Amino acid sequence: MNGQLNGFHEAFIEEGTFLFTSESVGEGHPDKICDQISDAVLDAHLQQDPDAKVACETVAKTGMILLAGEITSRAAVDYQKVVREAVKHIGYDDSSKGFDYKTCNVLVALEQQSPDIAQGVHLDRNEEDIGAGDQGLMFGYATDETEECMPLTIVLAHKLNAKLAELRRNGTLPWLRPDSKTQVTVQYMQDRGAVLPIRVHTIVISVQHDEEVCLDEMRDALKEKVIKAVVPAKYLDEDTIYHLQPSGRFVIGGPQGDAGLTGRKIIVDTYGGWGAHGGGAFSGKDYTKVDRSAAYAARWVAKSLVKGGLCRRVLVQVSYAIGVSHPLSISIFHYGTSQKSERELLEIVKKNFDLRPGVIVRDLDLKKPIYQRTAAYGHFGRDSFPWEVPKKLKY
């Protein structure tokens, strides 16, 4: 059941097909704990002061959470309470799990935003004309292979982790703990630049568990209650390989097993290795940080192009300079899946979207305290967010 120990299983891969793999991590993964705490801090400020300037990094290790960063805000935030509630929600509520929100130490090293940055970016400017908070390049990607316009590999990897959390919280699998990782390999066929998923080739699940449960029971439950509940049956066949709890034991997890840092799961947060990534992380940052707001806008552009039928798969790049409001460059790559040229698509994008941060914030409602929800299971492909609602394009 658990595949060959040497990993790769050379089942015949047909000509014109290829394998692609994406991973995801659960809420209790140490890096994801940090992302969620950073965004909980951001939300706490935005609830009281929608114009708060927040850059909050989190570090987690056994029994300790450290907040470090720069925040300028009119809000009065109880950081101890915000951090502990975030950890409690994730499920680390007892020292037997390796971490406990009630007893962990919360260290705060937060300062004001640099006045040099403030005067260069937003002071004495109309909101529409505020500058980008930093230089950088961001990408948005969309593909017609799923209803969400996301790669199937990352959609399934996220859903497996979400199902683990659901079965842990509702008591169906009481041996589950909050830390988990999943990885999904899909066999694809190329179709004139677009990609068509044919089957799931390999699934990996590693999830933290209590001392009592036996390996066979875990592997059986992961296959029957998690994988079969999440992965459509048409993608599974007798050649699908499963690596379920491949290390054999995963009792020590969360920040006790590994140190955690905000911003170390940027591929999990985006497209699972598809498209491209400019390197900037999302969590703990307000909308003036284009790492976040422009990546959300680029996804909005990409999804609008695909849902509008203008192409089947597309990559959008934007770039910025600190203090400059308009993007320095906008580029569109349609992989040959459009009737229109990339230049024509670029003109449509320029006509329909204003990619200044001070306009993105209005169009996507980015002053609302919605960010903690984005910090697990991916920022894209989930209906509840404004950047996932395609814009009707005029051209």
From Swiss-Prot:
Domain of life of the organism encoding this protein: Eukaryota
A GO BP entry: cellular response to leukemia inhibitory factor
Pathway this chain belongs to: Amino-acid biosynthesis; S-adenosyl-L-methionine biosynthesis; S-adenosyl-L-methionine from L-methionine: step 1/1
Cofactor: Mg(2+); K(+)
GO molecular-function term, one example from the UniProt record: identical protein binding
Span of the signal peptide: none
Other known facts: Protein expression is regulated by post-transcriptional regulation: in presence of S-adenosyl-L-methionine, METTL16 binds and methylates the first hairpin of the 3'-UTR region of MAT2A mRNA, preventing recognition of their 3'-splice site by U2AF1/U2AF35, thereby inhibiting splicing and protein production of S-adenosylmethionine synthase. In S-adenosyl-L-methionine-limiting conditions, METTL16 binds the 3'-UTR region of MAT2A mRNA without methylating it due to the lack of a methyl donor, preventing N6-methylation and promoting expression of MAT2A.
Family the UniProt entry places it in: Belongs to the AdoMet synthase family.
Name of the protein in question: S-adenosylmethionine synthase isoform type-2
